[in-house]
Regions:
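Conserved small/polar residues in nucleotide/adenosyl-binding loops
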Residues: 170-176
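Adenine-nucleotide phosphate-binding core of ATP-dependent small-molecule kinases
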Residues: 155, 162-163, 172
Length: 180
């Protein structure tokens, strides 16, 4: 998990801190890891593949769409099936995870067939502090011109973008928005 922390810096370090605290306080208790990316393990190849050169994507840690918020999406699908007495073999559902992090998933026959999040939790919908989908050319432009370092870019993409970005959504209120 330490090695994966750069891919999900808002999620993995706090989870590792809890794991280590539990190990220290109660080393006798077994710990079980449940990864929310597992819900997306069967994404079709054409969905999980990025249109990049194979030598980049076929590494020890393959570059592909993993999807995130799988525990929430699975729970929503199960709840939908309970409420509507739906049979997983005939159900098509779109689920939305809306919180500090946001994602959309399409589920057919109880299996995820599409997700808005990809290799990292940065991809997809605009979130509280993450930009969501972003033209890679913007990042190249910033790096090539020396506007930001890789470290600064990583920090900005995870902590200072999205609804906290330059549009300043944080200053909007619903009544003001409704008033036009």
């Amino acid at each position: 998990l330490d090695a994966m922390s750069p891919l999900a810096p808002l999620h993995n370090p706090p989870a590792l801190a809890v794991i280590r605290a539990c190990q220290e306080e109660r080393p006798d208790l077994p710990q079980v890891g449940v990864f929310d990316t597992a819900f997306f393990h069967a994404l079709p190849d054409y969905v999980r593949a990025y249109a990049l050169p194979a030598e980049w994507t076929e590494q020890s840690q393959p570059i592909r769409r993993y999807g995130f918020h799988g525990l929430a999406h699975r729970c929503m699908v199960e709840r939908f099936a309970t409420i509507h007495a739906a049979n997983d073999t005939s159900t098509r559902v779109i689920t939305l995870q809306l919180g500090h992090g946001c994602s959309v998933a399409a589920i057919r026959n109880g299996e995820a067939i599409e997700t808005s999040m990809g290799f990292t939790p940065l991809e997809g919908l605009i979130m509280a502090t993450r930009p969501g989908d972003l033209d890679a050319g913007v990042l190249l432009h910033l790096l090539e011109r020396g506007v930001v370092s890789i470290t600064e870019l990583n920090d900005a993409l995870n902590h200072r973008s999205g609804l906290l970005g330059p549009v300043s959504y944080t200053t909007l209120t619903l009544p003001a928005t409704w008033e036009g």
